[in-house]
A protein has these predicted regions:
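Conserved catalytic-core helix/loop/strand module for nucleotide-ribose chemistry
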Residues: 1-184, 188-190
């Protein structure tokens, strides 16, 4: 290990001790549990579109076309099926994230693997799935599901979802921005 790597590790440890460590978890962490990456998810949506719409190359538009052509219920069922919700378990990375004792965890993932790991390790994190959860924070530690959650029925995946994000999630957006301004952010799985 070189001096820069050692310095970074010490910086992360110090931030954790001072309750200033935030871990931002991307889809790469869940792939180790068998969850497909973004491209594979979009490809599964594309396969069910009419031939004339399969030529679309913009991922957000593909998701939007699927949702618009199949309806919301079928869209959500397809996403849940593609992401194997309820059929997967946390992997060692999920537990390692918790071992770092971050004061907050931010994720763009829709799955509940982090929540499962939290429950198995008997740790307390208040899960924020929607703006209305923020005023009721019960614990110092939070898990912020920045792109929504299946249980809350508010995932962010389509073109319209991204376009309307600041209107649909203004408090979560502001909260995450405040964390970026005041904490050490460690990105994992991007």
């Amino acid at each position: 290990m070189n001096n820069v790597q050692l310095s970074n590790i010490l910086h992360i440890q110090e931030a954790s001790k001072q309750d200033k460590l935030v871990i931002f978890v991307g889809a790469g962490v869940s792939t180790n549990s068998g969850v497909p990456m973004w491209g594979k998810l979009i490809e599964s949506l594309k396969q069910d579109l009419p031939e004339t719409l399969r030529q679309e190359t913009d991922d957000l538009k593909v998701a939007q076309l699927y949702k618009d052509s199949r309806g919301y219920k079928e869209y959500m069922e397809k996403i849940k099926e593609s992401l194997m919700c309820g059929k997967i378990s946390p992997n060692p990375i999920h537990y390692a994230i918790l071992d770092l004792k971050p004061c907050h965890i931010i994720t763009t993932n829709y799955d509940d693997l982090i929540e499962q790991a939290i429950m198995q390790k008997y740790q307390q994190y208040y899960v924020v799935k929607r703006d209305t959860d923020l005023p009721y924070l019960q614990y110092q530690n939070t898990l912020i599901k920045m792109h929504g959650d299946f249980e809350a029925d508010n995932i962010v995946l389509t073109e319209n979802d991204y376009y309307n994000y600041s209107n649909n999630f203004p408090l979560i957006r502001s909260f995450v921005q405040s964390l970026f301004a005041s904490k050490l952010i460690l990105f994992i799985g991007f």
